Structure formats: C-alpha cells, structure tokens
C-alpha cells in the first residue's frame, strides 16, 4: 500500500481548534470574552466514552503522548438519529511530528460491536450511538480510540453561511440535488457546500471522491475562518458548535494540542483503505482488502508509539 502525503489536509477536529487558536489574535476585553466563551462552549459539548480496552492506561496530552481521535460526521436530521457517514481515524505523534489519517468508507462490511452482527460500519451509530461506533472502529482497525469528535454534517451549511461562503477547487463538473458545480475554483454558500459533500454516485471514485470533497469544504472553512474579525461572527460560530458538535476532548486538551502538536499537524500521511465492492443478499458493501487493512493497522500502531 502506498501512503500519499497531501499538504494542508485538515480534519473536522481542526475546525474547533482553529476557533480556539484564533483567540491569541485578540486583545483586551475582546480576547477575554472569546476565551471564556470558548471554554464554556467546549464544556457544553462534552460527551464521555469508556476508556479504550486497547489501552493499559489513558494517554496524557499534557505530557505530549501520541494519541488517536475518531472524527465522526453524522447525518442527523429531524426525527432521524442518522448514521456515521464520515469516519476518519487519526493518530497524532508530536515526537515524530506526523499525523496519520485513514478514512473508512461508510459501506465497509464489518462486525458491529455490541450488536453481534455483520453490517455496514456506518450503521453502528444508528444501532448504538457514539460508544458503539467507537467500539466498532477499534475492533475493525485493531487500534485504540482515545478521543472522538462528532459533527452533524448538516452544520456545514450553518458554518459556511456564517463565514459568508467558502472557496473550493472542484476536480470535475457535476450536478446534485438541484445544484450545478463547475470544474475549477468555485464559491459555495451553505446549502451548496452541503450538496457538494454529499454527491458520490456521479464520482468515478465513489465514496473516496466524496470524502475528498468533504475535506475540501473543511479546508475552505478553516481558511475562511482564519480571517474572522467580527465578534458577532465568533458568537454565531460558537452557537453552531454548541448545536452540532460533541467530543470527549476538554478545553485544556484542545489548547495543549493547539500549542504542543503544531508540527504533527503540518505533516499528514493519508492512508487509503483499499478494497472492493460486493453484494451480499442484494445489498452493496465495501469489503476491505485484508492485506491492506493489516498494513494500515501496523502503521497506525507504530505512529502511537512513544
């Protein structure tokens, strides 16, 4: 399996970290307000999970231990708990200054831990919420999940509109859900950004192409967010986070990551989980290649070594 280094690829976690990191740009009462608002926002979105059984002891971000985080993009709507359609597992090692990232296709066929059945990995969230999804990913990759960040994908719309739109670079022209997207650099509003991240059937790369567009939108959000200067926009952004994000990271964790893990965030190794599509009882699944999965697991474990 070949690792592809993609510069400037960020994750949903950095959307939150960027907001916090921008606090250092403020001065006086402005910075004071933002600091305390950020702290209260993070406290309000906290959700606990069990300590990983694959860890003898909990990691310490304060001591600059390598750690892992699972990014969960959940497509929740009114009256529908939704599924974890985006699953990105990351390891962050400040000693080697590297971050390893693997996107798990939502149709991946695997054992759902806690339910005892084989199914699509994204169904784990519908069956048992955050904890079941974390347990299932740990079993699938055979690595610990220390932290998670769960984001309602619907929030992309609110975030993008709060920022006044974002710019992405579309690799080809396509239409989806009533919206048309040209090839090249395009500007998206909130509804367009959401549609842009959801299309996959017209993409020759299928779910992998969709994942790339999600990362493009995230990068666009981060780039635009770095230029926020209005306290009103900060207030709106905090509201979006409060309504759409859950994590077991504390405010201190986030601040330590922002200050002590900068080098690791600049060197990201992207792993693509190779496999093939198959049908079982008439239902489509993505069957991960066992050899490729084993190679990824080995590299992830190595990246978590101190």
Swiss-Prot record:
GO cellular component terms listed in the entry, alphabetical order: membrane raft; plasma membrane
Gene encoding the protein: tagU
Gene3D superfamilies with a match to the protein in the record: LCP protein
Disruption phenotype: Single mutant has no effect on cell growth or morphology under normal growth conditions. Triple disruption of tagTUV genes is not viable. Cells lacking this gene display a considerably increased transcription frequency of lytR and lytABC operon expression.
Biological pathway: Cell wall biogenesis
Family statement: Belongs to the LytR/CpsA/Psr (LCP) family.
UniProt name for this protein: Polyisoprenyl-teichoic acid--peptidoglycan teichoic acid transferase TagU
Keyword Transmembrane helix: yes
Outcome when changing residue 86 to F: Does not complement the tagTUV deletion mutant
TM region positions: 12-32
A molecular-function term among this protein's GO annotations: phosphotransferase activity, for other substituted phosphate groups
Impact when changing residue 85 to A: Does not complement the tagTUV deletion mutant
Sequence ranges on the Extracellular membrane side: 33-306
Entry's localization field: Cell membrane; Membrane raft
Enzyme class label: transferase
Keyword presence, Metal-binding: no
Organism field: Bacillus subtilis (strain 168)
Database matches in PANTHER family: POLYISOPRENYL-TEICHOIC ACID--PEPTIDOGLYCAN TEICHOIC ACID TRANSFERASE TAGU
